[in-house]
Amino acid sequence: MDLRAFIRLVPDFPKPGILFRDITPLLRDPAGFRAAIEQLAAGTATMGSLDYVVGIESRGFILGAALAQHLGLGFVPVRKPGKLPPPVLSQSYSLEYGQDQLQLHAHALRPGDRVVIVDDVIATGGTAAATAQLVAQSGAEVGGFAFLIELAFLSGRKLLPPEIPTHVVMVDESN
């Protein structure tokens, strides 16, 4: 199933000059949502044995939890600061204008665990790379990355380790 028809393009959101990819029409459609999860799951076949799906706030929670259920794995959320009770691991990363931070429960993952990191969109790659650093801090290993949409013109993959498999369902070349 071609999922592009379910992605709504919203110009100048959340800021002028941004073309937002709205996945809510996809989530609303049972067949489309199921196909998206199946296509994400198919991409994990090259990632070896996995223990957990790590979902990045916030749309990565939706896709990640559904993918975890589909694969029979546990789900671990990565959140913005102040959303998880302590103890947490923290990782700062650069934005276009400043810094941001992500957090992971300190005991959510253990050494030897293997995870796939999931988000709806890979744009600049900053949040995915920061999440991979959080996973490494925990002693776990990133087995792969899975994204619904890649904004290829932003070259976000360059921040991801090239030796780790990255699966993308849809590549968007337009800006």
UniProtKB/Swiss-Prot annotation:
Compartments annotated for it: namely: Cytoplasm
> What is an example of a Pfam family matching this protein?
Pribosyltran
Which Gene3D superfamilies does UniProt cross-reference here? Answer: 3.40.50.2020
Gene Ontology biological-process annotations = adenine salvage; AMP salvage; purine ribonucleoside salvage
SUPFAM superfamilies given for it? Answer: PRTase-like
Q: In which pathway does it act?
A: Purine metabolism; AMP biosynthesis via salvage pathway; AMP from adenine: step 1/1
Its EC number(s): 2.4.2.7
Q: List the disulfide bonds.
A: none
Which UniProt keywords are present, listed alphabetically?
A: Cytoplasm, Glycosyltransferase, Purine salvage, Transferase
Catalytic activity from the UniProt record = AMP + diphosphate = 5-phospho-alpha-D-ribose 1-diphosphate + adenine
Q: Is Plastid set as a keyword in this record?
A: no
Question: Could you cite one Gene Ontology molecular function of this protein?
Answer: AMP binding
The GO cellular component terms are: cytoplasm
> What is the predominant subcellular site recorded for this chain?
cytoplasm
- NCBIfam families membership: apt (TIGR01090), PRK02304.1-3 (NF002634), PRK02304.1-5 (NF002636)
User: According to its UniProt record, which protein family does this protein belong to?
Assistant: Belongs to the purine/pyrimidine phosphoribosyltransferase family.
Main role? Catalyzes a salvage reaction resulting in the formation of AMP, that is energically less costly than de novo synthesis.
Extract the PANTHER family matched here: ADENINE PHOSPHORIBOSYLTRANSFERASE
Q: What is this protein called?
A: Adenine phosphoribosyltransferase
